[in-house]
Amino acid sequence: MLARFPLYLRLIRMDKPIGSLLLLWPTLNALWIASDGHPAPSLVAIFALGTLLMRSAGCAINDYADRDFDRHVKRTAERPLTSGKIRAWEAIAIAVGLALVSFLLILPLNGLTKELSVVAVFVAATYPFMKRFFAIPQAYLGIAFGFGIPMAFAAVQDTVPMIAWAMLAANVFWSVAYDTAYAMVDRDDDLKIGMRTSAITFGRHDVLAIMLCYAAMLGIYVWLGAALHFGWPYWAGWAAAAGCSIYHYTLIKDRERMACFAAFRHNNWLGGVLFAGIAAHYALAVR
């Protein structure tokens, strides 16, 4: 078992934290806004650890669902499950175990948060299979990656206000943007095996679609900042995030694989500076 531990870590992408960070930033945004900038440390710990665990569970489920496809894609052919180093039942057992630990984390929280967690698990578990049916499965991914937003509001306020759903919508647009750039890396392989992705659906309009999704996401955050009367630290963070999106355009415009992958990874900075703006606004109490 100990000898297989490194394989399990690779299965759940512990060597690639970018996915966890892309989940974490929107969740932290929601925690800070829901609590007026003063979230309980215990809540921050619960949601941060829960984000890591559920992302890891999602990776295991994704590799199980895609095991017959991944062997035909150069980038994924050597994943532990695809290459036969881990059995299918092991991936399922790991995913279930991580999901159960995540649920144990939220046991001290209110009933609404627990109810929403059931929806979150369902969305996370079904996302990998959406790539067979939906033309833009990245939108479904945005819901899965952003469900920490309504859960955070539920945990703090015991309700999910409209602003939480607006933030979830923004996360859907953001996910379509960064995951389309990611899908551009594998587009040729995905076309051969019949996988459906937004990069394939958008076709020659892929770069335009990505930039429009960035614009929609940033536009929602303009509305959010105005509605909550945020001060200059927030807008500085927003401007930095907008700058990141422009930088991403310079990376993806020629559709070069490694540059598209770099744009995907750089979204960590976009999410980070936006959260920094929110946190700084509350920390400095600027109105």
Swiss-Prot record:
Specify one Pfam family.
Answer: UbiA
The prosthetic group or cofactor this protein requires is: Mg(2+)
Q: What class of enzyme is it?
A: transferase
Major place of residence: membrane
Q: What is its EC number?
A: 2.5.1.39
Q: Which UniProt keywords apply?
A: Cell inner membrane, Cell membrane, Magnesium, Membrane, Transferase, Transmembrane, Transmembrane helix, Ubiquinone biosynthesis
Q: Name one GO molecular function term.
A: 4-hydroxybenzoate polyprenyltransferase activity
Q: Which domain of life is it from?
A: Bacteria
Q: Quick one: a GO cellular component term? A: plasma membrane
Q: Where in the cell is it found?
A: Cell inner membrane
The UniProt entry's GO biological process terms, in alphabetical order, are: ubiquinone biosynthetic process
> Quick check: keyword Cell inner membrane in the entry?
yes
- Protein family: Belongs to the UbiA prenyltransferase family.
Q: Protein name, please? A: 4-hydroxybenzoate octaprenyltransferase
Q: What is the organism field in this record?
A: Burkholderia pseudomallei (strain 668)
